[in-house]
């Protein structure tokens, strides 16, 4: 029985390895959730970053809680998301574990710089949202960013998926 379980486990691990692919190198950052390594296009799995043309709003001056008047301004949250990812990677090699491909033939992957999960880091710092439609992996990280008013959670924004539908 033990031998049977060991064989089953080995076969299971082998099949899992067939579904994943490791991609590593110094990436070109396309936007907050897409990178290219060599000729491979990689979508950071489970997250959705603001689009490059997307604007978000944040309060930059609050008169007082009594008067209740805030000055808000639009900012390019998609560009900031991309820039923060560029700064985090800092021309270093990253390692991506791909689980499959999307409808655009991009690899869907979790990417790491050293031991830092970049997908998680983007969501936890308010630079992307958890892509709930495809994964529940980063919901706690999104809640953390929202609770602490980090990144896009400092103000108001449309979730990138909704913004794409409207634009």
Give the residues covered by each predicted segment.
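Small beta-barrel nucleic-acid-binding modules, primarily SNase/OB-fold domains
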Residues: 2-8, 12-167
């Amino acid at each position: 029985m033990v031998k049977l379980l060991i064989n089953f486990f080995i076969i299971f691990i082998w099949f899992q390895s067939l579904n994943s692919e490791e991609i590593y190198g110094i990436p070109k950052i396309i936007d907050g959730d897409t990178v290219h390594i060599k000729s491979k296009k990689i979508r950071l799995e489970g997250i959705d970053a603001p689009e490059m043309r997307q604007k978000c709003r944040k309060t930059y001056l609050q008169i007082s809680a009594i008067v209740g008047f805030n000055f808000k301004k639009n900012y390019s949250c998609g560009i900031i998301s991309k820039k923060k990812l560029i700064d985090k990677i800092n021309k270093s090699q990253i390692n991506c574990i791909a689980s499959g491909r999307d409808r655009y033939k991009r690899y869907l992957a979790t990417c790491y710089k050293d031991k830092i999960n970049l997908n998680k880091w983007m969501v936890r710092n308010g630079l992307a949202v958890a892509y709930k439609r495809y994964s529940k992996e980063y919901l706690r990280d999104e809640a953390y960013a929202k609770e602490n008013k980090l990144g896009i959670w400092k103000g108001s924004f449309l979730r990138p998926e909704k913004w794409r539908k409207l634009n």
